[in-house]
Amino acid sequence: MKGLKKKTTTYRLPKAKKHLVREESGLNVYPSTQDRELILQKKQTLAISKLYELKFGNYFDDILKISLPYLKKQFSDAELRELFDLLKSYHANSTRECVDYFGKVYCELVKKQYQMRTSPHYDTELCNFIGDKNSQIKIIWGDCYQVLKRLKSESIHLMVTSPPYYNAREYSKWENLNDYFLDMKEVITECYRVLDNHRVFVFNVGDIYDNDRLVTRSVWGKRRIPLGAYFIRLFEEVGFTFIDDFIWDKGEVQTQRHKHTNTPYPFYQYPINCYEHILIFHKHRLDKTRYPCPICGCLKVNDNTQSEIGLQSWECDNENCFVRSKSNRGKRFSLKTNITQRHQAEEYKISETLIRKWRKDIVNFPPVIKINSKGKNILGHTAPFPEDIPEVAVLNYTYPGEVVLDPFAGSFTTAIVASKYNRIGIGIELNKVLFRDNVIRILKKETSQIDLYSGYKKYAEYDLLHFTKTHRQKIMEVTG
C-alpha cells in the first residue's frame, strides 16, 4: 500500500561464518600465526637493514664499513641495535675518540654476553648495591662463598685478601686440613669466575706450625704446614697463573711460644715463623673473541698466537690502519695490552718510593699493632694485615674508579685503602657480631675526610646473613 515502508529481513550469520564470508570476499583476511611471524621477521630485517645504512658523519662510519661482517657474527640483532644506539648517542670530537669509544662499548657488550652465559641468575639487588656510586666502601655481611655466587662473572677488577688460617684463630675451626682446603677451593673457584679477565689476585698467607689432623690429633702430630705452597697449587688447579711471591719480613719475633728455654739441647730448638707470603696470581681465561685494533678500531684482525698461557693476541689486517711496520705488518695486541697501554698517562704513574719499596721480593714492614697499653684489642681482629699490602695491590693493579674486593674482609683494611685511592672498596665478612662495632668505629674515623671533600656517604652495609633456601631476608643499611 502507498505510504507504507517495505519490511526488510536481516540475516545474521554466526561469528565464525561471518569471518569466513569476509575472508572469501577479500575484505579482511586474518593472517595465521605463521604468517604473523613472517611479517614480524620481515619488519625486523627491514629495520636492521636500515640500521646498517645509518651514517654517523665521523670515523665510526669507517670502522663499521670494515667491521660490519664481524659484528654480524658476534652479536644478535638486538645487541647490534644496542651498539648502534650507543654510537649514535656519543658525540666524538676526533678519530681517536671514535676508536676508543667503539672499543669500549664493543668490549662491554662482549662481557655482557659472557656474563649472561656464566651468571644468568645473579642477584640484581646486590649488584645494584655494589654499583651504587653514593658510597665508595661497601660492607657485605655474609658467607663469602654464598655472596660470590650472587655476583656477575668478571665484574671485579682486583682481589686482595688474607684467608682465615687453618685452626690458628678462634674463629676458624675445621675437622682437618683437607676440609679446610675443600672450603678454600670452593671460594677461590668463585673468585676466579668473578674476577675480571687478565686481572690480579693478591693473596697474603703465612706458613704455620700445627696438626693437620689427618693421621693423629695428638700434640705430637704438629708439624710445619707450608700453606703458601699448598695455596699456590690450589690456585693453579682452579685456573690462576702463579706470578710472584713477595716475602713479608715482619721483623723481630714478639711471641715467646716454642722457645724451650728450659731445654737448650739438640732437637728441641727450631725457629719461629717471622715472615708471610704475598702471592700474586693472574687470571688469563683464554678468550678467542675477536677484539678491535687499538689503533684503527677495526675488527679486521688475524688470530696471531698466545703471547702468554691463556692470553690470546691479534694482528691488525686493515691495510689502511694508521700504524704499519716497515714490512707492512699490522699492530699486534691483546685484550691485556689494550687495557694497560690505554692508561700510560701522568695521572696513572706509580711513585718512585713505592717502586723502590717493592723492588726486591723480600719486603720489610712491621705487622699491625692491635693491642693497646691496657691489653685491649683495639681492632677487634686477631690477625689484621697492614695497609702496605692493599696499597701496593691497588696502585700496581688497578685504575681510579675500579672495583676492589676482599672476600675475607675482617677489619676491612682493603676496602678502606681502596677508597683512599678513589677505587670502590668491597669487603665480605661472616663474623658480624665479632667485628662490626670495631669496623664501624674505624670506618667513621678513617673516612671522615672522604665524606667532607668528596660528598660520598661514609659506607654502605648489606646484610646477607639471614639467607636461607626458602626465604631471604636482606637488610640494606646506608649510613651517611
Identify the function of each model-found stretch:
Residues 2-118, 124-437, 475-480:
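Core catalytic lobe of class I
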Residues 436-480:
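PRPP-dependent phosphoribosyltransferase catalytic core
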